[in-house]
Amino acid sequence: MKTSRRGRALLAVALNLLALLFATTAFLTTYWCQGTQRVPKPGCGQGGGANCPNSGANATANSTAAPVAASPAGAPYSWEAGDERFQLRRFHTGIWYSCEEELGGPGEKCRSFIDLAPASEKGVLWLSVVSEVLYILLLVVGFSLMCLELLHSSSVIDGLKLNAFAAVFTVLSGLLGMVAHMMYTQVFQVTVSLGPEDWRPHSWDYGWSFCLAWGSFTCCMAASVTTLNSYTKTVIEFRHKRKVFEQGYREEPTFIDPEAIKYFRERIEKGDVSEEEDFRLACRHERYPTRHQPHMGDSWPRSSAHEAAELNRQCWVLGHWV
């Protein structure tokens, strides 16, 4: 399906804008990874009345029993054992923050993911953050150049220059985005194994912010391919039109009719030709057809001076200029 140069430019702008929106949303949200954490249930005196022997039905059954003694260390005591002592809470993590569900009520508690990352991975995490910022900035530059190309659509040369620069910036942004996403994934996986005990996930998976980030990368690369395709097609079309223009208006070199040469040679040998008739040998001129292929001996394109020289050379017959 053939598309115009302006149509290809509009498609590239739309893809670049979509990539920019996806990348910005993913960078600012905290749903790159999400899952559950296994935490101990709150004991007696910490809002965990259901776990206390003197609450509810346990208080009625044990109304005559002696008060429950605290543990030697003074910590709340839990009567449950095994996996019943733990409960799962949901969490979600982004580049900047990790938020966990509050067990005692609605709301979330957030802390910096940079502080949660192991010391050995903080440098990689900061490099990932810088790469994400550069990724977004290069997307903005590429988007601006593509918009300028639309404004200069009447000028082919200016449009080609802007198209080339937009393609370069878009490709560079896509490469930076891919590296940034991979580095963050590596840091998160290491933090799952070596992070703080109270944060380590029991189970986790990638969230919608992670999907947006890779969707942004996909749109970015699609925009770069579309821009490069537009640049290549425009150059090829320009060269083709120029070649057709040059060949369509060039005249074929003048040549002598071989039958006329044979006729005058025979008459000269017989002595029947006069001087006036000797000047009547004319050169034939023909214009190239639309799809004319030059002779093997011809070398095109030729300048007008070369064509004039060949005209004079081929019209010199039998000692006279024709």
Swiss-Prot record:
GO terms for biological process: regulation of AMPA receptor activity; regulation of postsynaptic neurotransmitter receptor internalization; regulation of short-term neuronal synaptic plasticity; synapse organization; transmission of nerve impulse. Expressed in the brain (at protein level). One of its GO terms (cellular component) is plasma membrane. Residues 30-122, 185-207 are extracellular. Residues 1-8, 144-163, 229-322 are cytoplasmic. The modification Phosphoserine is found at S274. It is a multi-pass membrane protein. As a component of the inner core of AMPAR complexes, modifies AMPA receptor (AMPAR) gating. Component of the inner core of AMPAR complexes. AMPAR complexes consist of an inner core made of 4 pore-forming GluA/GRIA proteins (GRIA1, GRIA2, GRIA3 and GRIA4) and 4 major auxiliary subunits arranged in a twofold symmetry. One of the two pairs of distinct binding sites is occupied either by CNIH2, CNIH3 or CACNG2, CACNG3. The other harbors CACNG2, CACNG3, CACNG4, CACNG8 or GSG1L. This inner core of AMPAR complexes is complemented by outer core constituents binding directly to the GluA/GRIA proteins at sites distinct from the interaction sites of the inner core constituents. This is Germ cell-specific gene 1-like protein.
